Amino acid sequence: MESCYNPGLDGIIEYDDFKLNSSIVEPKEPAPETADGPYLVIVEQPKQRGFRFRYGCEGPSHGGLPGASSEKGRKTYPTVKICNYEGPAKIEVDLVTHSDPPRAHAHSLVGKQCSELGICAVSVGPKDMTAQFNNLGVLHVTKKNMMGTMIQKLQRQRLRSRPQGLTEAEQRELEQEAKELKKVMDLSIVRLRFSAFLRASDGSFSLPLKPVISQPIHDSKSPGASNLKISRMDKTAGSVRGGDEVYLLCDKVQKDDIEVRFYEDDENGWQAFGDFSPTDVHKQYAIVFRTPPYHKMKIERPVTVFLQLKRKRGGDVSDSKQFTYYPLVEDKEEVQRKRRKALPTFSQPFGGGSHMGGGSGGAAGGYGGAGGGGSLGFFPSSLAYSPYQSGAGPMGCYPGGGGGAQMAATVPSRDSGEEAAEPSAPSRTPQCEPQAPEMLQRAREYNARLFGLAQRSARALLDYGVTADARALLAGQRHLLTAQDENGDTPLHLAIIHGQTSVIEQIVYVIHHAQDLGVVNLTNHLHQTPLHLAVITGQTSVVSFLLRVGADPALLDRHGDSAMHLALRAGAGAPELLRALLQSGAPAVPQLLHMPDFEGLYPVHLAVRARSPECLDLLVDSGAEVEATERQGGRTALHLATEMEELGLVTHLVTKLRANVNARTFAGNTPLHLAAGLGYPTLTRLLLKAGADIHAENEEPLCPLPSPPTSDSDSDSEGPEKDTRSSFRGHTPLDLTCSTKVKTLLLNAAQNTMEPPLTPPSPAGPGLSLGDTALQNLEQLLDGPEAQGSWAELAERLGLRSLVDTYRQTTSPSGSLLRSYELAGGDLAGLLEALSDMGLEEGVRLLRGPETRDKLPSTAEVKEDSAYGSQSVEQEAEKLGPPPEPPGGLCHGHPQPQVH
């Protein structure tokens, strides 16, 4: 019956520019999947991550591929079931690619029920139609053997349906198909394909059901096998314009294979991506990115979207987190809101009634002022204390308004006052008699002050009538210049907000002769001084004469901005405002040149953000440091200009201001690192011409540092701890770039410069020192026609995948790779392990000699396949006996470096 079954190559019909021969693939039509007909379903999916694919030299797998819901103490395995059918049946499973349509994979399944073709089969029925596969392992095929393995699989599948053999033409077709499959196949991801066959009338299992495909299974040793996870963000909301800087902590990611995706889960399907470069990914565990703008600039209320991490190549995503876009704040400083307030009419300040008097009171005599209800509102700063409530005090106590009662033109004498007040004496006696002499004395003093104030106001009004100069009125009312409205704005604030230049000049003149009042530096409820508002509203002339009368430019608003910071954010008017500040001669101006805002940006950085070479010149000519570093990441003005791709600013900084092209950030990145990482050929060329160091290394090791020893011995406590960071080479601009044009520029520049001194080998393991003969032999092995790109797989295993595209077009990719590994401080054991895992035992024999065999580190521990813990090779050997030792030595000897 076995010979009656033909698994075929389901799904391997076409891929891009190649097609399989339909005469080779002849699958039978599956039974229709209907509500009444039989069909196959997956009951338990396989676990996607944490399972390691095994090479042949490693021996059989242990534990088996677990199920998706498997836990400690309750293990599950991939399970399928035939529904709507009872009777004998056969269920088989093989490996297919992770891309659609599924195609046969070069890897094979191994286990008790698996054949040489990598197909595992079990029988089910007639009652229980469920099949559980509890002993599946994945045999990893190396790239070197991949071509031969694929040809063998295709040949055997073809011969099962036609035993007479293949012609030469068919053999060539199979080889071409295998070659094309190799180009598109990912060796780190597989899927299980379950196929069910029912018994036919002749007794053979030849009636196929529709196959079902499992979810992808990732090799735990592959760089992209770890789950993506967002651990923390410092911001969950930002402006609809985008550009907000967010710090995101995450599980391990690869800087060249990660992006931050913003999206909406609705019918519109909007998505955008965070803006960051490879240098913004810190140690693979943190990303600093800038939010993208929302697709609608005008929103009335906050909008919540989602963000997630996404791998560029595999398409894997993390769990989504929420992010809120809030509406655009056009009037952050509230200037427009205050301008929209209704202007007062002439009669409003007088409390109603006739504009010559308030309330029901008549005209006051002498200098007593207006009577009636709200007349006291004219003197809020002078009436700090009064022993009487408004309108309740004795009318004869002081000359002035109150209560709406009409008053005499002169202060009455005591006798006439007593005689006149006699008819109403009973009603006033209870109020006056309890007053102590001290209170009466204070009331008299208060009345005297009011009388003097009225006299001064009257004199000012008379002077105004003669001169028509409003300053005469303001001088008499100068004590009222400190009055504030509900927003904390003084008359000077309001005059600046409304652009009343003549009023501002008049108030400033009075302020100049009344410095003791401190009006010029009073702040409103937003911590804005008049100078802040003059800068915000772009009134350069007002800025100048405010500074002349003592305005302090060093005072900060609620955002931590001084007048200079605000001037540099003023857009087109920034140069004139900045010039007015710098030429004022204020003592605080030199201090402002070296004062950061609350975001850690100095004026030179804000000038770059403003894209203004003129402002940069003004600042540097006044004493600002062009090499000043902002406090968040240590970037200079040249770093910021490079990030913004501002060719004009970069040219200006380098040629005129002589900015240091090799200045480093806190992470050791130069402007050339940023230009290369962002893929800017023009800026890269400019920086190289200006003398940028092509060999400059940042602080992130190209190869990861080895794990500290976990031994309990006392050896690791002897002597001082060594700093291994200096023993490893960091990333150069060439390591960071993904742009072909930038790579060409950097490679050409590297050929014209001297190589940097070799980095000493790491003290953590035997250093790699390749002789010319060994290097040539390895180049022949890895670059030969039979190698089929083995050097690229070696780069990935050595943690140097970022160099694959860089060295692909060189005459000897493997030679360049090995020299980089040697310069990076790579050790011999790591290279031996990588070659052994790839099945390149000849390379192992080339490197291993009598002098190096004894220097290899002791056998390391390897992870258990099912990801429930780990057991050492020695423990596995006790259970299974000694595994077959491959020629050339151990398959495991050193922890595999992780890929950046």
Swiss-Prot record:
One of its GO terms (molecular function) is sequence-specific double-stranded DNA binding. There is a cross-link at residue 855 (Glycyl lysine isopeptide (Lys-Gly) (interchain with G-Cter in ubiquitin)). SUPFAM superfamilies: Ankyrin repeat, DEATH domain, E set domains, p53-like transcription factors. One of its GO terms (biological process) is response to cytokine. Signal peptide: none annotated. Keywords: Activator, ANK repeat, Biological rhythms, Chromosomal rearrangement, Cytoplasm, Disease variant, DNA-binding, Isopeptide bond, Nucleus, Phosphoprotein, Proto-oncogene, Repeat, Repressor, Transcription, Transcription regulation, Ubl conjugation. Residues 888-900 have a biased composition (Low complexity). InterPro entries: Ankyrin_rpt (IPR002110), Ankyrin_rpt-contain_sf (IPR036770), DEATH-like_dom_sf (IPR011029), Death_dom (IPR000488), Ig-like_fold (IPR013783), Ig_E-set (IPR014756), IPT_dom (IPR002909), IPT_NFkappaB (IPR033926). It is found in: Nucleus; Cytoplasm. One of its GO terms (cellular component) is cytoplasm. Component of the NF-kappa-B RelB-p52 complex. Homodimer; component of the NF-kappa-B p52-p52 complex. Component of the NF-kappa-B p65-p52 complex. Component of the NF-kappa-B p52-c-Rel complex. NFKB2/p52 interacts with NFKBIE. Component of a complex consisting of the NF-kappa-B p50-p50 homodimer and BCL3. Directly interacts with MEN1. This is Nuclear factor NF-kappa-B p100 subunit. The lineage of its organism: Eukaryota, Metazoa, Chordata, Craniata, Vertebrata.
